[in-house]
Amino acid sequence: MRTAKTLIEELRLSPHPEGGWYREVWRAPEEEGERALASAIYFLLEAHQRSHWHKVDAAEIWLWHGGDPLMLSHSVSPRGPVREVRLGPDVIAGDQPQVVIGAHEWQSAVPLPGTEGYTLVSCVVTPGFKFSGFTLAPPDWRPGA
């Protein structure tokens, strides 16, 4: 049986500063200046976890792989408005299997209630992710609040 704990172990994930679990799985060898052209991670949120509000200085593509659906909230401005996109498998019901978040957009994610107890996605960042380009908002902050 696939559980969050099993996937965390099998995928060799580590705690992520924004919440959840991750592991970088790819970084493009080509570089633009001192930065890779793109990078990718596995990212897993357990049912009780969330990806806290943060922004990245690069475009980010979220790709849903398994588990429960995920609500991805995002805003181009710290003043709002906040938009929500549901990532998941049921495209007929309106789920999106992937979504692009623009560079410098505020974003947050939370698994939706379901039977699996986790959500597994990949995040592809271009140009490649650097922690120096990552900003984590204060606890309980949200755009427009």
Question: Predicted segments — roles?
Answer:
Residues M1-V100, W106-A109, P113-G117, C123-A145:
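Non-catalytic, conserved peripheral segments adjacent to functional cores
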